[in-house]
């Protein structure tokens, strides 16, 4: 029967199978919802997997308070339209300390407002499994991570101590306090994601489409000026350029690309000739050598 499935149908079936397995084997799962294209695909798959019922788990957004405004508007609109259970967690201690990407740098900001905040939320609600939208084609540390990725009671990850997943048989056993991060999109590529979004008509944040936007050039990256908190460096000037984003995060740490791709068809065509990873647009991946693996070891998404 599977021989008659298309490539995207096979990926969809695998992801839905993983989601249903987690729902059946864990007492308190959660889906991490970062609002980007991969999260939009995860949300769509979750709605499909348990239809006509709603997904039997909440969706958690870790809000750094520095996301693009259009991302937050999109998040709230989707939650209202689809009626899923949305949890929003902010590291209030980090807010009180004034942690921000300008004064503290991307490394400190990401650790406190994302990694620590995520660990806080997982502990607060007692989740034993957390879905994430990471894909193996994104980055080398994600390439070697299992679909079911074991985490200690302190949410740390040891890449040298991973469980085998031969024949797509997943080990779901965890002791008290331990948890699993689950990545249903592990075997998808960026092109797969866009072709699936086009095929299924999945709503996405408008920032993915090319449009004239106010930007500055900083450190070889094109940064969008999203609000009045943007601190310009000496000599920097804001200019209007036709840009879009391949990846979304905190706006001061996310680079845009020059593009005229204003439709899903345009984006798919652009992806067919792309020769770089979307992660090149994320400043947090440039902090230091092995930056992403270090973050993941500490409990990052």
Curated annotation (Swiss-Prot):
Gene3D superfamilies: HUPs. It is an enzyme of class 2 (transferase). The keyword Nucleotidyltransferase applies. It holds the Pfam family PAPS_reduct. One of its GO terms (biological process) is hydrogen sulfide biosynthetic process. The keyword Mitochondrion does not apply. Pathway: Sulfur metabolism; hydrogen sulfide biosynthesis; sulfite from sulfate: step 1/3. GO terms for molecular function: ATP binding; sulfate adenylyltransferase (ATP) activity. Heterodimer composed of CysD, the smaller subunit, and CysN. With CysN forms the ATP sulfurylase (ATPS) that catalyzes the adenylation of sulfate producing adenosine 5'-phosphosulfate (APS) and diphosphate, the first enzymatic step in sulfur assimilation pathway. APS synthesis involves the formation of a high-energy phosphoric-sulfuric acid anhydride bond driven by GTP hydrolysis by CysN coupled to ATP hydrolysis by CysD. This is Sulfate adenylyltransferase subunit 2. It comes from Chelativorans sp. (strain BNC1). The gene is cysD.
């Amino acid at each position: 029967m599977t021989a008659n499935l298309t490539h995207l149908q096979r990926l969809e079936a695998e992801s839905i199978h993983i989601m249903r397995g987690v729902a059946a084997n864990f007492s308190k799962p959660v889906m991490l919802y970062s609002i980007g294209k991969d999260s939009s695909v995860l949300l769509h798959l979750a709605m499909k997997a348990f239809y006509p019922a709603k997904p039997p788990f909440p969706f958690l957004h870790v809000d750094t308070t520095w996301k693009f405004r259009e991302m937050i508007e999109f998040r709230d609109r989707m939650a209202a339209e689809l009626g899923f259970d949305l949890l929003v967690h902010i590291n209030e201690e980090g807010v009180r300390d004034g942690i921000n990407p300008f004064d503290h740098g991307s490394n400190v900001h990401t650790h406190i407002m994302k990694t620590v905040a995520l660990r806080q939320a997982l502990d607060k609600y007692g989740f034993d499994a957390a879905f994430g939208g990471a894909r193996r084609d994104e980055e080398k540390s994600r390439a070697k991570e299992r679909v079911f990725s074991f985490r200690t009671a302190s949410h740390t990850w040891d890449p040298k101590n991973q469980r085998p997943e031969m024949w797509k048989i997943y080990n779901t056993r965890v002791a008290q306090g331990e948890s699993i991060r689950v990545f249903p999109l592990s075997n998808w590529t960026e092109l797969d994601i866009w072709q699936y979004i086009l095929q299924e008509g999945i709503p996405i944040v408008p920032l993915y489409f090319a449009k004239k936007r106010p930007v500055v050039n900083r450190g070889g990256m094109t940064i969008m000026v999203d609000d009045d908190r943007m601190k310009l460096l000496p000599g920097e000037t804001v200019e209007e350029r036709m840009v879009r984003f391949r990846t979304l995060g905190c706006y001061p740490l996310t680079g845009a690309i020059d593009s005229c791709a204003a439709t899903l068809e345009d984006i798919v065509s652009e992806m067919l000739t792309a020769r770089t990873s979307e992660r090149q647009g994320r400043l947090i991946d440039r902090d230091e050598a092995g930056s992403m693996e270090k973050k993941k070891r500490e409990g990052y998404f």
